[in-house]
Amino acid sequence: TLIALLLTVAGCAEVQRAGEDIARQSGNPRLAGAIHGVGNVVGSLFPIGYEEESSIGQAIALQVVARYGGVVDQPELVRYVNLVGRAVANTDRPDIPYRVAILEDESINAFAAPAGYIFVTRGLLKQIRNEAELAAVLGHEIAHVSQKHILDVIQRSKRLAGVTEAGLSYATSNPAAFKSVIDGAVKKLLDEGLDQGKETEADMVGELFATRVGYDADAYVGLLTRLRDLKGDDRALFKTHPNFSARIDAVQKTIQGKHLAATGVLLQERFSRMTKRV
């Protein structure tokens, strides 16, 4: 069954708990099932439509939640972070219902899965000082979705060709086929990281997303600079992204080249009030 297929992706007990957590936070109870319509994914990945993207995103999201120990259960905080995310997510893909979850993990990182699943760790939230910085981080992850970076990785996967050729019947009768696609995407997302070009594009596009709704353009540079100063340019601090100096340079060039306003709002007081229990 499709549920059995999902359970092979991330382990039964962990997936069930993760599904319940993310379903509660997103307000979408179907996410506990997570893999509805997955047969269509492997039958029509070229091009990937939203229904297929959603199934892929749900499967990846559950793996992220399971690996990072679940999500923070603070409804007011989660609602606030989602409101900031939705303000920033006025992208060229209005079909995407973006939702943000906070991972119960002290590492400093953030992730995005297809179909609008955005994750920030508790550790990263502790490093953020104002709402403009939060908006820039969320803008970066939203850009990964709007630019279809993870879907591009999946489409380029050599393993995918064999799965698509086999089609629907192969996927439903051979869970390992779909699992290999998802596992490859998760490995790229969580362990290896996207290529530097995609990360640079996400920084630039995310900066545009955040500043066009009024957030200060220099806020992101401030955050990246502080993160760099924690351990120099040690990539292990933010292991799935390029080094901070390169990112800071690229963002500054975007600010100058696009004439972005460094006079936008920071909203430090509101951010501090809403995140005091992080």
Predicted features and spans:
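Bacterial N-terminal signal peptides
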Residues: T1-A10
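A Zn2+-metalloprotease active-site environment signal
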Residues: C12-V278
